[in-house]
Regions:
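Short helix-coil-helix linker/hinge
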Residues: 5-8, 21, 87
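Short helix-coil junctions and helix-kink-helix linkers
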Residues: 29-37
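A short, conserved structural fragment
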Residues: 50-59
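Short acidic, hydrophobic short linear motifs in intrinsically disordered regions
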Residues: 22-30
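Pre-recognition alpha-helix immediately N-terminal to the DNA-recognition helix
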Residues: 10-15
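Amphipathic alpha-helical dimerization/coiled-coil segments
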Residues: 79-119
Length: 119
């Protein structure tokens, strides 16, 4: 399932991924403390996530359950970025991504292991 999340929707999902299933009121309290959102803003964003199929609403008390994983969103967002900026070329993406950063020996070793697993 590929769902495009806006930044505000991503914030709600991050709370659910980090904390697990919660009542909407609990999400509102967390986001009030973390980023200053009021209750109405949080409920509006939760409802948008429900409409997109990212969250399931369960009763009683507006219980929210994430229907998509962080990994699914990361994959979809990464694919969109690669398609948009690199013409779909993962090689160009990795080349650009790795050219500016100094990688540690451990990071280089982990990348080599990942590539070897693909063979």
């Amino acid at each position: 399932m590929s769902i495009k999340l806006f930044d505000s929707e991503q914030k709600v999902m991050e709370v659910l991924w980090r904390e697990g299933d919660l009542h909407a009121g609990q999400i509102a309290e967390i986001l009030k403390d973390e980023i200053g959102w009021n209750r109405n803003t949080t409920y509006t964003v939760i409802k948008k996530c429900i409409e997109k199929g990212a969250i399931e609403r369960q009763e009683p008390k507006f219980f929210c359950k994430a229907l998509i994983s962080r990994e699914e969103v990361q994959k979809a967002e990464t694919k969109e970025l690669i398609d948009k900026l690199f013409g779909g070329s993962r090689l160009q993406f990795f080349s650009a991504f790795l050219s500016d950063d100094k990688l540690s020996e451990d990071e280089i070793s982990e990348l080599k292991d990942l590539v070897n697993k693909l063979k």
